[in-house]
Structure formats: structure tokens, C-alpha cells
């Protein structure tokens, strides 16, 4: 900040956007190769380059914000707007999945037997694993709020405890969802019911994994004293994202599991 007279962060040239774009190309091409030719080589290469890009890019962001002081109040304001717009774009993504579900279920075609769930589909009981999943995610929403309040009050130990509980609940949710998929009496290829169910819940499951990763990074950063009560946007963004994942699950549970069954 010694050589500039403004509060904005002029980012240095970085290779990570380019490697990120290349890894995305490799992953999507790898998915096609996996689906059509049962070869995972390209997919594994894409995933590896993606993980390396994420690690090194976020490492640079942490250095710039925590150690070099580039994240001034003005820069943080821009990051907040960016995170809000990102979450809005995710809301629109899920809107598409809900649209597909309601379009198919509110007026079932004769091919589906004129009923919902379609003829031959045995839906999951919403009062079993899905209800447990709901309570797990709601509990994690409480614990992440506890972590945020503890951080604001400067209580580091409580913040770490609450954050650890949130991460554990996120991992537990993922394991429950995986077991539910494994035991489900229908598959993604079982017509429109299977495809809308697995795409919507699977995409949400992916968001839980991303959110858990975000929180794990925050946990290790807090172990190294990176957050203070007035400088912690990395954690705040993770908390916003986690609450978004919570709310989406409530809509999924009510729509697909409860009403849709």
C-alpha cells in the first residue's frame, strides 16, 4: 500500500484463471469420455489440475488479504457484492431444477401414467433419512451462527468448536445422502422422476461438499489466527453460502421428498 494513493487492490498478473479454464475444459471433456468410453484418465487429469489451481489461487488470496493488507474496506465491499451476486446466480440455477420438477409433476403426461410419482416408481419415505438430513442441516445452520457470534465477540475457542461441529454435520449429511443414493429403489435413468430427483438433490449434495470444503479452509485459517472480530470476510462468505445451502435443502425436502412422493 506504500506506492498507491487509493484504497483499491491492483491484482498482480496471475496464471490461475488460465489454468482454471483449462482444468474446466479437461473436466467436462473427461466427463464425456467417462460416460461414452468408460475412460477416467482425462477426468482425473482435470480434477487434479482443478484442485491444484484452487489451492494455489486461494493461497494467493489469503496472502494478499491477511499478510499484505490489500483487502481494505473498499475491496471487502466489492467482495461482498461479488458473493451476493454469486449466490443469486446459484438461486437461479436451482430455480431451473425446480421448474423442471414442477413442470413434470403438476401435469403428468400419459407416458408417465397420468400420475405422480410415475407408474412403477417407488419413492423414498420423506419421514426417514430425508427428515434426518433436514434436522442435520438445520442443526448445522444453528452451529455456524454460533461460530459467527463467537467470532464477533472475540471468543476463539467457542468459534473453533462451533465451526468443527458444523463441518462434522456437513460430512454426516454427505454420508447420509450417499447411503440414500446407494439404497434408492430407482436410478437417474428411470425417466423424468429419476433424472429430476438425482440432478436436483445431487447438485445440492455437490454444494454441501463445496460448502464443507470452504468451512474446513476457514477452520484451519482460524487455527492460525487469520480472523479477527472486524476482519473476517472469508468466514462470513462461507457462512452465507452455508445458509443458502440450508434454505435450498428445505425447498428440496418440501417439494421433491414430501410433496413429490
UniProtKB/Swiss-Prot annotation:
It catalyses: 4 Fe(II)-[cytochrome c] + O2 + 8 H(+)(in) = 4 Fe(III)-[cytochrome c] + 2 H2O + 4 H(+)(out). GO terms for molecular function: cytochrome-c oxidase activity. Residues 35-40, 106-128, 184-190, 257-261 are mitochondrial intermembrane. It comes from the Eukaryota. Pfam families: COX3 (PF00510). Keywords: Membrane, Mitochondrion, Mitochondrion inner membrane, Translocase, Transmembrane, Transmembrane helix. SUPFAM superfamilies: Cytochrome c oxidase subunit III-like. The chain crosses the membrane at residues 16-34, 41-66, 73-105, 129-152, 156-183, 191-223, 233-256. Residues 1-15, 67-72, 153-155, 224-232 are mitochondrial matrix. Its main location: mitochondrion. The keyword Transmembrane helix applies. GO terms for cellular component: mitochondrial inner membrane; respiratory chain complex IV. It is an enzyme of class 7 (translocase). It is a multi-pass membrane protein. GO terms for biological process: mitochondrial electron transport, cytochrome c to oxygen; respiratory chain complex IV assembly. PROSITE patterns: COX3. Its EC number is 7.1.1.9. It is found in: Mitochondrion inner membrane. Component of the cytochrome c oxidase, the last enzyme in the mitochondrial electron transport chain which drives oxidative phosphorylation. The respiratory chain contains 3 multisubunit complexes succinate dehydrogenase (complex II, CII), ubiquinol-cytochrome c oxidoreductase (cytochrome b-c1 complex, complex III, CIII) and cytochrome c oxidase (complex IV, CIV), that cooperate to transfer electrons derived from NADH and succinate to molecular oxygen, creating an electrochemical gradient over the inner membrane that drives transmembrane transport and the ATP synthase. Component of the cytochrome c oxidase (complex IV, CIV), a multisubunit enzyme composed of 14 subunits. The complex is composed of a catalytic core of 3 subunits MT-CO1, MT-CO2 and MT-CO3, encoded in the mitochondrial DNA, and 11 supernumerary subunits COX4I, COX5A, COX5B, COX6A, COX6B, COX6C, COX7A, COX7B, COX7C, COX8 and NDUFA4, which are encoded in the nuclear genome. Belongs to the cytochrome c oxidase subunit 3 family. This is Cytochrome c oxidase subunit 3. The lineage of its organism: Eukaryota, Metazoa, Chordata, Craniata, Vertebrata.
